Amino acid sequence: MDLKEKIRIIDGFPKEGISFKDITTLIGDGEGLKASIDMFVEYLKDKEIDLIVGPEARGFIFGVPVAYALGAGFVPVRKPGKLPGETISVNYDLEYGSDSLQIHKDSIKKGQRVAIVDDLLATGGTVEGVAKLVEEAGGEVVSLAFLIELIDLKGRDKLGDYDVISLTQYDI
């Protein structure tokens, strides 16, 4: 299935000059959602994944069903103040500023094999921060998997030697 046929493009959102990739049309379509999950699983199934890590919020949409299909656990990555237990944090740079993300300190055990699943690879800043969190917790980042990659933003270049896959690619 061509997933691009299920992703709506909205020009001028959230501001002029942006061509927004709206995944709500894909996840609202049973065949499209199933196909995207199946594609992630097909890529990751032989990588001996212990945990799927997903950044909020759209990483949850894809990460949980992929974890289920692989028989792996799921670790949510949240903004500060959203997790009730003891956390570890990472600050990461955005195009215009910085942000922070957290996971529970005990959510990843030393040596666990981790795939990070998210909806979008743009500049790579968010996923680079998530990978640092995983490694700080003792996990091994085995793969970074995205529904969409905006290739002109060169996020893949920022991610060095990590194994990166994207199910669809767009020029911006």
Curated annotation (Swiss-Prot):
Its main location: cytoplasm. Its EC number is 2.4.2.7. Keywords: Cytoplasm, Glycosyltransferase, Purine salvage, Transferase. Homodimer. Pathway: Purine metabolism; AMP biosynthesis via salvage pathway; AMP from adenine: step 1/1. InterPro entries: Ade_phspho_trans (IPR005764), PRibTrfase_dom (IPR000836), PRTase-like (IPR029057), UPRTase/APRTase (IPR050054). This is Adenine phosphoribosyltransferase. It comes from Clostridium botulinum (strain Alaska E43 / Type E3). It is found in: Cytoplasm.
